[in-house]
Amino acid sequence: MANTPSAKKAVNKIAKRTQVNKARRSRVRTFIRKFNDALAGGDKASAETAFRNCEPEIMRAVSKGVLHKNTAARKVSRLVKRLKAISA
């Protein structure tokens, strides 16, 4: 339990940041889900469009501190690999 005023403020700030970070992480997952749906549909053009929307969102999460850069690089790499597989 936070006793000092500064500790109470810190608890409130952490709760707010947690909500923001959850929203950002959810947004990334939504974009990845849209990409997966486009791939499942088999339409190369829509999959490429979904990837072009998805990749900047992942990198934005990195710049905001939600994802680690290596995690983002791994996610993007796997998405590109799957996109190329449908193209071939």
UniProtKB/Swiss-Prot annotation:
A GO biological process held by the record: translation
One CC-aspect GO term: small ribosomal subunit
UniProt KW keywords: Ribonucleoprotein, Ribosomal protein, RNA-binding, rRNA-binding
InterPro entries: Ribosomal_bS20 (IPR002583), Ribosomal_bS20_sf (IPR036510)
Name of the protein in question: Small ribosomal subunit protein bS20
Pfam families referenced in this protein's UniProt entry, alphabetically: Ribosomal_S20p
PANTHER family: 30S RIBOSOMAL PROTEIN S20, SMALL RIBOSOMAL SUBUNIT PROTEIN BS20C
Segments forming a coiled coil: none
Protein role: Binds directly to 16S ribosomal RNA.
One MF annotation (Gene Ontology) recorded for this entry: structural constituent of ribosome
Assigned protein family: Belongs to the bacterial ribosomal protein bS20 family.
NCBIfam families recorded: S20
Keyword flag rRNA-binding: yes
